């Protein structure tokens, strides 16, 4: 409790039915689910999007075009181009539709910095270098960053959520 503080009761909407699927991988599929929910009068308070980004691009909708920026940079809507993005052509409009249905939106994400395939994700490489340089990830006693072992997200970094600066950086990247 010293680390996290006392437990706080979550808002009421947290206790309602949640809609979620790892198979909704585009705005059209999500909009179809909203229509089905309305047509069949399925009660829900939350819609969870799991496939909104891939696991390497952790802070923006997948397929958004942008310039590569230093790892300290936090992208805003105006910097992201969805012109050629057929899967998520307008995340802002989709979020508004979800809200119009009276739902809260949760973007599911593993809180990791995934090791990208060499050269395929230059922005992820910038973000990882910045996190390591600033000790925003869990570090080994040797001073090297801890990397996930075999299995899920092999080679990925874990963000150090006990570091207030790491938390602020992570939150700013998602704002």
Where are these regions (language model features)?
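Aromatic-lined carbohydrate-binding/catalytic grooves of carbohydrate-active enzymes
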Residues: 8-175
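Extended acidic/polar, glycine-enriched regions
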Residues: 1-7
């Amino acid at each position: 409790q010293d680390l996290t503080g006392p437990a706080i009761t979550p808002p009421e909407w947290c206790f309602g039915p949640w809609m979620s699927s790892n198979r909704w991988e585009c705005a059209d599929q999500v909009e179809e689910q909203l229509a089905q929910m309305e047509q069949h009068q399925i009660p829900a308070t939350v819609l969870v999007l799991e496939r909104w980004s891939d696991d390497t691009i952790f802070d923006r909708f997948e397929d958004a075009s942008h310039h590569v920026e230093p790892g300290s940079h936090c992208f805003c809507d105006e910097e992201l181009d969805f012109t050629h993005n057929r899967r998520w052509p307008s995340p802002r409009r989709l979020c508004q539709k979800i809200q119009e249905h009276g739902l809260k939106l949760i973007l599911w994400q593993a809180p990791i910095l995934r090791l990208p395939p060499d050269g395929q994700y230059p922005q992820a490489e910038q973000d990882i270098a910045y996190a390591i340089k600033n000790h925003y990830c869990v570090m080994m006693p040797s001073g090297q960053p801890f990397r996930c072992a075999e299995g899920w997200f092999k080679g990925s970094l874990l963000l150090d959520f006990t570091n207030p600066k790491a938390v602020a950086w992570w939150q700013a990247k998602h704002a």
